[in-house]
Amino acid sequence: MYKFFDRNGRILVLRPDMTVPVARMINTKLKDMDLPLKLFYTANVFRVHESLEGKRNEYLDCGIELIGGDGEIIDLEILVTALEVLKSLNTREDFKLEIGDVNILRSAINEMNLGEEDKENIIDLINKKSLINLKDYLENLKIKDEYKEFLNTLPWLFGGYDMIEKAKGLAFNNRVKENILYLEKIFLNLKELGYEKYISVDMSMVPRVNYYSGIIFKGYVTGIGSTVLKGGRYNDLLENFGRKSSAIGFSVDVNLLINSCNYDEKIDRKPILVEKDNYLIKLKEKIKKTRDDEYLEIVDRE
């Protein structure tokens, strides 16, 4: 992050993303509004990257946040919206939405009675996919062999549905298994909705920020070496600003996504309504109806 000091010695930071500012606004300017609440934004954000990475440190961020909604239905709504954003702007359909859940790795590590430093080091090695160093690090820890096998194997489990099956075979307690089963349910529902070729899983996905609390995801487009879309659930963040509420959202790097756009086709926007009862069947039917020549827009349910 870019950090500065004001004349009183206080640390000032250029915003690295918009999620935290939105969480703060929910507890100030919007504190009297009823939930659930849907927001969108466009703003410049600033991040410091390693030198020679070829990445910009300032870019245009565009995103949505759903405040006050939790559970499978809401997670699916946001994931479908993310998929349709990528699909509408990339008619070649050479993109992937990679999905994970922070609770899979988090619940496993919390079971191992490790110190905070060891936890952070393990997560950092997994995040960097530094698997040889991870194996060496685990060898020096006094933990069960099944724990070591889980941590050494999980980073290799990325791809299609079969990776979920393999992860279930490694689960060493009910909490870990429950988190894997939830991700499986999300994957199968997206498959049922017709998105299987656009999605993959990463069973060890770890975000760079620590406020995520559940489903997380990243969008990639062929030929672009960076993530163009990212998001997830952050149920605990708003409580830091005074108002406890569940939340989920995502943002896109506008500049990167524009590079993947195909403007040859004019798209008519057609909103669809999805009721809560039998939502999956109804959503699937309406997606099929709009699949060929119309744009899918998810709007508020009654």
Each language-model region and where it sits:
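Short, structured active-site "lid" loops
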Residues: 1-14
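Short beta-strand elements
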Residues: 2-4, 113, 217-221
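Positively charged, Gly/Ser-enriched RNA/tRNA-binding surfaces
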Residues: 9, 17-32, 39-92, 139-302
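A conserved hydrophobic position in a structured secondary element of the catalytic/binding core
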Residues: 14, 100, 252
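Short, conserved phosphate-binding/catalytic loop or strand-edge motifs used
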Residues: 58-62, 99-107
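A short, ordered amphipathic alpha-helix with a cationic face
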Residues: 93-97, 108-112, 123-125, 138-140, ...
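Acidic carboxylate-rich catalytic motifs and surrounding loops in phosphoryl-/glycosyl-chemistry enzymes
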Residues: 97-101, 300-301
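Short terminal or interdomain "cap/linker" segment that borders an active site or interface and mediates
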Residues: 102-136
